[in-house]
């Protein structure tokens, strides 16, 4: 261990909607949390998989996008000062002799926490990669699975692979900035917003971009620079295409990953919990959201919010066994109003 661990009362693994709401529920009980996520921004599946698709089953919110839900949750938890540690995967979780939990991440950051909340969805998301020998040497140089700096593609010959929202969104965004944009998909059928598909076809018809149906089967590189790719169609015909940068959007593959090595009871790649505390088989470790399993489990954001509330109360009792944990309401409690930074209402 290179650095002294950050000591905490609570560490939340996963910054999706349920992990964010876990911050809120803990905050109401005066428990401050650190949040760790392997993705570069908060939001989990909502941001990575469907940022602009409508969600209709959030109570009292007739419709919102994944991005809007994430933004609202981040605003809701602002009063509680959670510290975020993004872009790093939790690799190790070990119970210490004093009962505390030592958490280690891929960035060699360590935490020593009294409680841990695993809100990792279906596990850590990893991009599905292009399966060509030696291609990994070009990653983050000329082959990208995430776009962090879109300006770097200006004036370049860009090839984008994929048939979902990410592929089409970036194709439409870069078509006016890049020297050329070619979209490659294995079939002429796209799982993206209808408006995006229509716009893409319009741009192809006017020769402002190109669509190729097929798969990349080989490539040529020189001095760590991508020079050319070869696309093979369904009939076996090949076409060579010059390229500067290649953007791959084959989707994200959820992997349980290191969680499987933490000594927790697992059933069908999910963590077994009780439905009173949502505690795992190790005291002080809770699992909420899609990562857990119990009789009658439904993988809904709404269900995850409920689980986060009960897990927070369980953790409060675990952290303060001699203290009676009072249920207070945000409508009437001056204490909660102070924590939330709002004034207590007056009633005539």
From Swiss-Prot:
<feature type="binding site">
    <location>
        <position position="50"/>
    </location>
    <ligand>
        <name>FAD</name>
    </ligand>
</feature>
<dbReference type="GO" id="GO:0004324">
    <property type="term" value="F:ferredoxin-NADP+ reductase activity"/>
</dbReference>
<keyword id="KW-0560">Oxidoreductase</keyword>
<comment type="similarity">
    <text>Belongs to the ferredoxin--NADP reductase type 2 family.</text>
</comment>
<feature type="binding site">
    <location>
        <position position="331"/>
    </location>
    <ligand>
        <name>FAD</name>
    </ligand>
</feature>
<dbReference type="InterPro" id="IPR022890">
    <property type="entry name" value="Fd--NADP_Rdtase_type_2"/>
</dbReference>
<feature type="binding site">
    <location>
        <position position="125"/>
    </location>
    <ligand>
        <name>FAD</name>
    </ligand>
</feature>
<feature type="binding site">
    <location>
        <position position="290"/>
    </location>
    <ligand>
        <name>FAD</name>
    </ligand>
</feature>
<feature type="binding site">
    <location>
        <position position="90"/>
    </location>
    <ligand>
        <name>FAD</name>
    </ligand>
</feature>
<dbReference type="InterPro" id="IPR050097">
    <property type="entry name" value="Ferredoxin-NADP_redctase_2"/>
</dbReference>
<keyword id="KW-0285">Flavoprotein</keyword>
<protein>
    <recommendedName>
        <fullName>Ferredoxin--NADP reductase</fullName>
        <ecNumber>1.18.1.2</ecNumber>
    </recommendedName>
</protein>
<dbReference type="Pfam" id="PF07992">
    <property type="entry name" value="Pyr_redox_2"/>
</dbReference>
<dbReference type="GO" id="GO:0050660">
    <property type="term" value="F:flavin adenine dinucleotide binding"/>
</dbReference>
<feature type="binding site">
    <location>
        <position position="45"/>
    </location>
    <ligand>
        <name>FAD</name>
    </ligand>
</feature>
<keyword id="KW-0274">FAD</keyword>
<comment type="subunit">
    <text>Homodimer.</text>
</comment>
<feature type="binding site">
    <location>
        <position position="37"/>
    </location>
    <ligand>
        <name>FAD</name>
    </ligand>
</feature>
<dbReference type="InterPro" id="IPR036188">
    <property type="entry name" value="FAD/NAD-bd_sf"/>
</dbReference>
<dbReference type="InterPro" id="IPR023753">
    <property type="entry name" value="FAD/NAD-binding_dom"/>
</dbReference>
<dbReference type="GO" id="GO:0050661">
    <property type="term" value="F:NADP binding"/>
</dbReference>
<keyword id="KW-0521">NADP</keyword>
């Amino acid at each position: 261990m290179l650095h002294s661990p950050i000591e905490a009362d609570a560490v939340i693994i996963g910054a999706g909607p349920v992990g964010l709401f876990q911050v809120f529920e803990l905050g109401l009980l005066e428990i401050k949390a650190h949040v760790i996520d392997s993705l570069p921004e908060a939001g989990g599946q909502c941001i990575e998989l469907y940022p602009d698709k409508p969600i209709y089953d959030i109570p009292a919110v007739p419709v919102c996008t994944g991005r809007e839900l994430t933004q609202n949750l981040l605003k809701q938890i602002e009063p509680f000062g959670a510290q975020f540690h993004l872009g790093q995967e939790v690799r190790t979780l070990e119970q210490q002799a004093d009962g505390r939990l030592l958490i280690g991440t891929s960035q060699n950051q360590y935490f020593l926490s009294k409680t841990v909340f695993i809100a990792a969805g279906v596990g850590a998301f990893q991009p599905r990669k292009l399966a060509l020998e030696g291609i990994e040497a070009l990653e983050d140089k000329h082959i990208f699975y995430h776009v962090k700096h879109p300006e770097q593609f200006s004036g370049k010959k860009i090839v984008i692979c994929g048939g979902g929202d990410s592929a089409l969104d970036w194709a439409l965004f870069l078509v006016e900035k890049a020297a050329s944009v070619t979209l490659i998909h294995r079939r002429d059928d796209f799982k993206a917003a209808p408006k995006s598909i229509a716009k893409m076809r319009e741009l192809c018809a006017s020769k402002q971009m190109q669509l190729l149906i097929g798969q990349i089967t080989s490539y040529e590189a020189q001095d760590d620079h991508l020079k050319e790719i070869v696309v093979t169609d369904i009939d076996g015909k090949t076409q060579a295409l010059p390229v500067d940068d290649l953007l791959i959007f084959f989707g994200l593959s959820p992997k349980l990953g290191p969680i499987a090595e933490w000594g927790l009871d697992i059933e069908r790649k999910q963590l077994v919990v009780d439905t009173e505390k949502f505690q795992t088989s190790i005291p002080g470790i809770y699992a909420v959201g899609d990562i857990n399993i119990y009789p009658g489990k439904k993988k809904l954001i709404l269900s995850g919010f409920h689980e986060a509330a009960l897990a927070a109360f369980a953790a409060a009792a675990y952290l303060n066994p001699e203290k009676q944990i009072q249920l207070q309401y945000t409508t009437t409690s001056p204490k909660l109003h102070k924590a939330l930074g709002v004034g207590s209402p007056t009633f005539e």
